From Swiss-Prot:
Organism: Magnetococcus marinus (strain ATCC BAA-1437 / JCM 17883 / MC-1)
Origin: domain of life: Bacteria
Gene responsible for this protein: pyrB
GO molecular function: amino acid binding; aspartate carbamoyltransferase activity
Pathway: Pyrimidine metabolism; UMP biosynthesis via de novo pathway; (S)-dihydroorotate from bicarbonate: step 2/3
Protein name: Aspartate carbamoyltransferase catalytic subunit
Length: 329
């Protein structure tokens, strides 16, 4: 790829909506270079020495927060973790007041997870630092989408494909409350994949076809037939304010990914899940642990490399291609 075309020029990583193919490619190329670092005996590089990264989490998240913390530290950045429960936010401080406090610290990047959609965009308008959206309400979760893309890309050859073009991907479950579903729909469509939302009508956004350009299936068997990739989503009961389904047991009976339903997909189909997994609710244990089909643990491992890549581009404004980055590591 032409280095000029592979340049990353954005100040923030707020979402997958609007990112071009070459921008997604720049992150994935860099992530592949950083992945090698994580397999060295000494898993540390001086890439972000002297840079300050603040992880500001208003919602709990073991995987995402730990992944961002480790990503920053492995690149020698100074990393500060702030959780809402232990910060002034718990005492009534507004997000705008928090912005003023952060501005005084002069960080290079702020990683924000927040329960309100649009909160990272608010920070980007008021804070002189790069902002990474680590999940905002039901809006987007771009780094989860990027690690999903990297995981799929790793398996293109065994799937008999050279790119995402024409790939069939089913995103199944609680799509309504899922920021992961939204980010993946935007990204996969940009890369040329065909995306299906599969789930009960009560858990499907009304704007699915118009906004995301996907096809919608309310029958699990129909939605899974012939797909190359399955991305299962958990039921986000904490975001449900009314009865969206009769019972968890009935949900699994109709919408759970079982071995029998997996057989409806392509023989090479990948099983993915952003976590945390609810076994026996959206996915059966023998499917989640299937060594030939499940790549769930690969997703976790790739998350670290992707977040290193995003921090690298935002902190350095780097427009290097992957070969140049690899030489510098």
């Amino acid at each position: 790829m032409d280095p000029e075309q592979n340049a990353w020029t954005r100040r923030h990583m707020l979402g997958m909506d609007g990112l071009a193919r070459h921008e997604i490619g720049a992150i994935l190329d860099s992530a592949q270079a950083f992945r090698d670092v994580n397999y060295r005996e000494i898993k540390k590089v001086p890439t972000l020495r002297g840079k300050t990264v603040i992880n500001l989490f208003y919602e709990n998240s073991t995987r995402t927060r730990t992944s961002f913390e480790l990503a920053g530290k492995r690149m020698s950045a100074d990393v500060i973790n702030i959780s809402a429960s232990s910060s002034s936010a718990a005492k009534g401080e507004t997000l705008l007041d928090t912005v003023a406090t952060l501005q005084a610290m002069r960080p290079d990047v702020v990683v924000l997870r927040h329960g309100d959609s649009g909160a990272p965009h608010f920070l980007a308008r008021h804070l002189d630092a790069g902002i990474i959206n680590a999940g905002d309400g039901q809006h987007e979760h771009p780094t989860q989408s990027l690690l999903d893309l990297l995981t799929i890309q790793d398996h293109l050859e065994e799937m008999g494909k050279s790119s995402f073009e024409g790939m069939n991907v089913a995103i199944c479950g609680d799509v309504l409350h899922s920021r992961v579903a939204r980010s993946n729909a935007f990204a996969l469509r940009t890369l040329g994949a065909n995306v299906r939302f599969v789930g009960p009508p009560t858990l499907m956004p009304s704007e699915a076809t118009k906004v995301f350009g996907v096809t919608v299936h309310h029958n699990m068997e129909e939605g899974l037939r012939g797909v190359d990739v399955i991305i299962m989503l958990r039921l986000q009961l904490e975001r449900m304010t009314s009865a969206y389904l009769p019972s968890v047991r009935e949900y699994f009976a109709y919408w759970g990914l079982t071995r029998g339903r997996l057989e409806l997909t392509q023989p090479h189909a990948l099983v993915m899940h952003p976590g945390p997994i609810n076994r026996g609710v959206e996915i059966a244990s023998d499917v989640a642990d299937n060594p030939n089909r499940s790549v769930i643990l690969e997703q976790v491992a790739n998350g670290l490399a992707v977040r290193m890549a995003v921090l690298y581009h935002l902190c350095t404004g780097a427009a290097r291609n992957s070969a140049q980055l690899g030489e510098s590591l």
